[in-house]
Amino acid sequence: WLYFVIAHVGFVLIMASFLTMTNFAGGSFAFADFRATQFSPAVASVCFVLAFFGFGAKAGIIPLHGWLPKAHPEAPSNVSALMSGGMIKIGIFGILKVGLDLLSASGVQVWWGLMVMVFGAISSVLGVAFALQEHDIKRLLAYHSVENIGIILLGVGASMAAMALNSVGIAVLALMAALYHTFNHAMFKGELFLGA
């Protein structure tokens, strides 16, 4: 039931973000219109924060991670491999899509990147701390996924902050590192769950 609740809370936050963008983009749901609209900094920030926590619930960031260690032990290993290897990466994609693409005309703000890095750091440190206390292999791997999502978010946040400060080289390097680790985690975590 916890996954059901968190998934629906995430859905409501994502919908609120997209409905806000639609409202300020002339009533259009087209991504091209979102990209072309220069939202005010306040509206862009509201849209990003809603999307971040909505997609963060899908990705399993702390404090929205509670469903991961409960769902993985209940699911068959092949389903856990798919969930951790693929499904939670959709949350990362959503954060990147909204923050770096759909709100691009409004410009990325430094504090967005800092917020993403703070939640990434919290998720990575607490994820590994919880994993060290686990004796159930699937729960351990679930907390390990929380940690790795945190590491990925550190790169995403660093990229956003650097982009806002016009440090293009650092922004590209941080984003490449985040995307590389996203792919890396998708490959090895699926294998670990299949072996669990």
Whereabouts are the PLM-identified features?
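Hydrophobic transmembrane alpha-helices and their helix-loop junctions in integral membrane proteins
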Residues: 1-196
